[in-house]
Amino acid sequence: MVASGYARTYRANSVLTASPGQLVLMLYDGALKAIGLARVAFENPPEDPRRIETINQQLLKAQSILAELQNGLNLEAGGELASTMHRLYDYHNRRLMEANLRKQVGPVIEVERLVRELREAWAQMLAQNDGNAADRVRSVA
């Protein structure tokens, strides 16, 4: 119990002290965690009473995080890249909605792969630019 309280405090402080670029990375991590938990729940036996609830909760959480990433885009300053990212986040959300409605794992696996690629690219950009450029290009996250 105490350890989880420390973990919550650490996460809260991490968010408060993170650069905009690091916040985007945290959002990707959160989306991947939720998507992964939903994917694992799909593997649970159909008679598991919490299976459907877990899938639904985790997919909704992932959709909410992806919506935050999408809402953070500055379509004017970000130009074509921001527009492309906006459409990509929209696609991710539609696929997760489809997975949730039809209770199919395929779209979850697809979106997990796509979001992981975005997360890796973002992390690489942060590492290469030491976070400085990430602050300037937050509008296209």
Which stretches of residues belong to each language-model region?
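A structural signal for well-ordered alpha-helices, especially hydrophobic packing surfaces
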Residues: I35, R39, L66, Q70, ...
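Short, well-ordered alpha-helical segments
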Residues: A31, G78-Y91
